[in-house]
Amino acid sequence: GFKANLKGHYYKDNFHEFEVSSLKIWNRSIPVSGGGYLRIFPWIMMKHLLKRYLKDNDFYVLYIHPFELSERECPQLPSSTSASTRQRFNYGRASVPKKLAKLINLLESNGFKFSTFRDLLVERDSL
């Protein structure tokens, strides 16, 4: 089995997994870590979810897909990709840089500091 020594971090041997930040709403786990949810949700909704999450948690995992920050068109998707998936990958991309800046500002105003997973593991090993 996996061991846990930091909240949201699980490991076995040299394999490490960091849990994405999420909220339980109506018995469902809703990710609030960024990525597609940051792109698709309106900022007012994302801000509300983030504030709820930050109230009860002292860590936050942020992730962004590189294509979400690119001004270039999404790379060619396989021809078997459904129209709804194609739409989902493109929807809201123009809003991501502004939302990301707001998200970072919200985290900093709540006392959060930024780090990498590697630095967290080095810090853990030095304890």
Report the location of each language-model feature:
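Active-site-adjacent pocket scaffolds in enzyme catalytic domains
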Residues: 1-63
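C-terminal domain-boundary segment and adjacent tail
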Residues: 40-127
